[in-house]
Design a protein with these regions (language model features):
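N-terminal targeting leaders
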Residues: 2-166
Length: 166
């Protein structure tokens, strides 16, 4: 009897491992068209972020939730657009323009991602003060509800706080 239980456990573990491997190898795309752009590129050794890539199974899981986000705000008359994600296509070009025109960030390598009116900053800066200044600058852009600051000082790969491009 114990051999049977062991065999079942081995089969279950193998099935889980096979499923995880299949998901890891599944093609991943920016299925939701989340805006993801490089804003500056002064530090060529800066680790490149992966960006918003999803496997087909993840897209199916997230589609309903993403379709609903921001609907109650719109119905109450507090929001201009019926879905939080619809703002991102407008916000990210304004963020890019603002950061490029500012002049304080020309010595950085920065990528920005827009998801649900939240702007995620990824890349490399010269100092912690510069990272804070970048975050504060992005908070000033119209329609931005928040900023996720994943910037790192310098270009060391081991200091990266975001998934890297493959």
């Amino acid at each position: 009897m114990s051999n049977r239980l062991l065999w079942c456990a081995v089969l279950a573990a193998s099935a889980c491992a096979a499923q995880a491997l299949a998901q890891a190898q599944a093609p991943r795309t920016n299925a939701f068209n989340d805006p993801f752009v490089q804003v500056t590129s002064a530090l060529p050794a800066c680790p490149v972020p992966e960006g918003p890539l999803y496997a087909e199974a993840e897209v199916r899981e997230l589609a309903h939730v993403r379709a609903q986000h921001g609907g109650s705000c719109y119905r109450a008359g507090r929001c201009r657009l019926p879905n939080s994600y619809l703002y991102d296509a407008e916000i990210i070009p304004r963020v890019r323009l603002y950061l490029r025109e500012d002049g304080r960030f020309d010595d950085t390598s920065i990528w920005v991602l827009g998801e649900r009116r939240l702007v995620t900053l990824m890349g490399c800066v010269q100092s912690a003060e510069q990272a804070r200044a970048l975050e504060k600058a992005v908070e000033l852009v119209d329609d931005v509800m928040g900023v996720v600051n994943l910037l790192q000082v310098g270009t060391e790969r081991s200091a990266t706080r975001y998934p890297l491009a493959r």
